[in-house]
Amino acid sequence: MTSNDVRDILSLPERPASQPSSSAQASGSSSRNRKSSGSNNPHPSSAASASRPKPKYDGMTRELFALLGDNAPSLAMTHGLDAEGKPVMGLGGLFKPKFKRRKEKVRQWRWTPFLNSARDDTQIDDDVPEINHGLILHHWAPARSFSTTAADGISAEDADIDTKYQYAAFNTTSGVYSYSNDEYIQHLRDDDWTKEETDYLMELCTAYDLRFVVIHDRYDWAAAQASFLAGSTSAVPQPVKERSMEDLKVRYYAICRRLIRSRISTDDVETRQMLLSTYAFDKQREVERKKAVARLYTRTPEQLAEEEALYVEIRRIEQNEAKYASEREELLRLLGGWESLPSSSPHAVAAAGSGIASLLGAEEDSTAKGRAGSANKKRKLQQIEDNGTPGADDAGSSTGATAAATSRPSANLTSKQRAELRQAQFDEMQCIVRFASNANATTDASAGGIAGPAAVSAASSSTRPPYAYLVGTASTLPAVTSNPANPTSGHGVYLRSSRMLAPRPNLVLRTTQVLSESDPPVGPRLIFPTAKNVEKWENLIGAVTTGLEMRKQLERVNAELRIAKQRIAAALHPNRMADKSEASAEAVESRSAAPTENSIAATTSTHAQITIKTE
């Protein structure tokens, strides 16, 4: 407890700042001694830090602020910010101030009359208040606005009437069109409408602010015509026609469009067209819309349930759209035929499904011919530069067969071609297949180069039919894709029988069963896996799996077709389908309840045969 606490408890006045206490003097002298004795200490003591004066914050008691201890105050307390981050003077702004009564006198409100200048039946003149008249309304208003004294000749009651209504400026109208007699005669004549009835319609539109529901309810041309004939002696009565709301709208909007077209305006063409479009009205469409709404509100519970079922079915179809699309593509690929496809690319599959595979094949043939012609020209120029013998053109135009290559004279072949020929003959004798890059193999095969079976097989790999239901690597494709950046890279030696196409796991059993049921039966494995045998085996497995999938798709489509026919028949003949279902149920019950004589005889003969065999 410090001296300040004691003074606070005893309610003593605070010590003046010029007269420090003895304890403070003693503490000051001791602190000075410690400072002089320990001037070389780089870390000041905690007592020295505690003796530092702390800033005083207004708006918070000393005890509450002492709870902070040695902790630093928050930024809001330091900078004097309130709870919303607004700067205030001192710490008192952190707390909600107490309620302070305003020193001004409370305003008085009076129930006072006023005139609305926006009304047509109200006339207001500030210069001559005596002639002000109209519907007097009342509202609550401050009394100070009516503290003026009454003028001479004006009663106190009239002086209290407020003539400046603050909400009169917000009164707006729809801008109903008006016309003159000349405009009506020149542009607005109609055989179905008289001028008097048209004027009556425009008056109602102005009175009810184009609210056609109210206008149609208040429309009574028979009574209006009677009053008009009573006031005029030369008018001839006309037959009164029944007018619907659509008839009133058609007449009003037609008048507006004709007036817009006939009147001179400074607006451009686009503005006038937009203005005309705002007054467009289609009577037939409006009638059909109202009929549709009436039918919508008169639906039965059965129709509502059917509509809900249709909505659920549509949502289900939308959710399964991706699945149906994939099944459709698969079915088109099956119907298009896998044998007619030149390659397994997505474009070729789509072309086969849409029936344009022939066009795609023609384009590929023309492209291949163009590549072959350019390759022949390059090879001819290269041979002329090497040997100066243009006779090598015959070798470049060959089909690439080995027998044709051996029949050529060796004088027309270069050293590179002779080496390729010897290598091709050796590979053919030893049944060796060498895979080259796809680009080089395709170019050499199309150009007729002598690369042997390797080039032929590599080139034919791009024209192999796709096997949609086989997995693995085809025998005509390398096990590892060659890298064009590194032509010398390749794969190791492997057995051809270890890399063959196989059916999918879900088709293995059915494929094996179909092969065993064939004539002659075919085993599940290939005995002599040569290159030709492997290729034929893959063709056979691909045909079997494709046929199985096609049969599965056919059964599914037939089942869906049968269900659709049953639904159509049930929708067209509901009573007949109910009779058939009842008849079939009765037949099943009769067969299960009472066996026929034939079944009893058959059962008896069966028992007799079993008895004879056992004896």
Swiss-Prot record:
| Protein keywords | Activator, Chromatin regulator, DNA damage, DNA repair, Nucleus, Transcription, Transcription regulation
Q: Where is the composition biased (Polar residues)?
A: 595-615
UniProt cross-references to InterPro entries, sorted A to Z: DAMP1_SANT-like, Swc4/Dmap1
Compartments annotated for it: namely: Nucleus
Which GO biological process annotations does it have? chromatin remodeling; DNA repair; negative regulation of transcription by RNA polymerase II
Main subcellular localisation: nucleus
Q: Which PANTHER family match?
A: DNA METHYLTRANSFERASE 1-ASSOCIATED PROTEIN 1, DNA METHYLTRANSFERASE 1-ASSOCIATED PROTEIN 1 FAMILY MEMBER
**Sequence similarity:** Belongs to the SWC4 family.
What is the name of this protein? SWR1-complex protein 4
Which species expresses this protein natively? Mycosarcoma maydis
